[in-house]
């Protein structure tokens, strides 16, 4: 476990050297991920059609990451028309087959899962996984949370983004849905 943490920290430092760290309210660099079905999704593409985009970075080797995915799936079902979702593994050895196994094991139905998130993850300067970020339609970071967010908190965050015109920069989870 200690070796894994050191390796992850080293990778994060290397990656953040190639990306400017996205601070709350500042632009998020565009990136593209590979979806389970082999298609590509770019952050910029979703930002053209959605009010905001939720980025959820996870790693299969952390059990708690998978525990958060049902909450993300529920949010996708509720807010998917207004908010884009990029749910992406940061694991370099992740494959379409391992994503399919994770989907089956966690009873995920329609939540889109993607590969290739490690370099995009680095731009947020976080040492924690899972990481949840909401990007405003203008491409700026509107919310960032390290760790398991949970269904109720995620719902409160996304409700604010759906109901607000213009960019947000929320430092904490709202106490109640507005």
Language model features with spans:
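Bacterial N-terminal signal peptides
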Residues: 8-16
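Non-globular targeting/processing and membrane-anchoring segments
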Residues: 10, 21-34, 38, 160-178
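A short beta-strand-turn-helix
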Residues: 32-53
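Short pre-active-site segment immediately N-terminal to redox-active cysteine/selenocysteine motifs
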Residues: 50-53, 57-62, 128
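Conserved redox-active cysteine motifs that mediate thiol-disulfide chemistry
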Residues: 57-74
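Conserved segment of the thioredoxin-like fold in thiol-based oxidoreductases
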Residues: 67, 77-116
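Short, internal strand/loop/helix patches
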Residues: 102-137
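Thiol-/selenol-based redox modules, centered on thioredoxin-like
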Residues: 134-178
